Amino acid sequence: MVALERAGVKVDRYVAFEIDKYAIEVGKKNYPQIEHRGNVETADFTEFKGFDLIIGGSPCQGFSHAGKKLNFEDPRSKLFFEFVRAIKAVQPEYFLLENVKMKADYENIITEYMGVEPILINSNLVSAQDRKRLYWTNIPNIKQPEDKGILLEDVVGEDALVDRDKAQAIIASIGRTIHREYFKKYQGQLYKAIMLSNIYGGFGEKKPRVHLNKSVTIRTASGGGHIPSLIINDKAINFTVDEIKECTRKVTPLECERLQTLPDDYTEGLSNTQRYKCLGNGWTVDVIAHILKGLKE
């Protein structure tokens, strides 16, 4: 609904199929007019014949190179075929399907079903997040969004500094806090990006010189996991594992909302764990809004 509003598309009726009770709670809080119908697998889509637009995306874990690599045999991936079933029953004028980059074989199968070639859009054009996704749609004249030049410094809290223009991914996963063993294993691979300003008594007027950065990919990981922090890359300091633990923090739910170009506090009211999950499973709103603007042309 946020994307439709930003695209200037008037909505008379919005029906959602969602089984995650926390995602439903967020939807009801922000848009009480949404009709929630629960499990898509039991839906009789003929009820909605004549609706103008169907938009959706099956869980990315089933298609992605990451995760368990279960592809089309994964029950989560089979939700794609529910999308196909919905289109056949409803026969909307327009559709939009989102999914992750995947093997060419799987991409080609989806393309064959959808009847249109996908467009690859990186969220970093409209946000501070690196998030490449494929979009299959018959909405006309979809081009790449203009780069808004949004940097990580634009979304992080005032207690942090960043150091790159466009970053590698950081995963905002469901679950646990950072621990010593995690840093021992991965600290050399994580790109150093944020330092809390209250470390060593604050920076005062002599803040370290930093190079400002695009961020992170927010994504969820099945079965829990860690939320890697953004870490300083100050050449004047060589951090030990314990020192890294002292000067790092998680990306906050508010920052994740901004990375997904949602309104501040959109997921407020849930636990942080559930906020991370909802945000990781969601879309970058301004990418969707960019595509939906084609409905008005």
Feature annotation, model-predicted:
Residues G27:
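Conserved SAM-binding loop
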Residues Y22, G223, T284:
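Conserved Rossmann-like nucleotide-cofactor binding loop
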Residues A43-L53, C60-G225, I231-V241, C247-R249:
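Class I S-adenosyl-L-methionine
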Residues M1-V9:
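Conserved SAM-binding loop of SAM-dependent methyltransferases across substrates and taxa
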Residues V15-K21, E98-N99:
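Conserved acidic E/D residue at the C-terminus of a beta-strand in Rossmann-like folds
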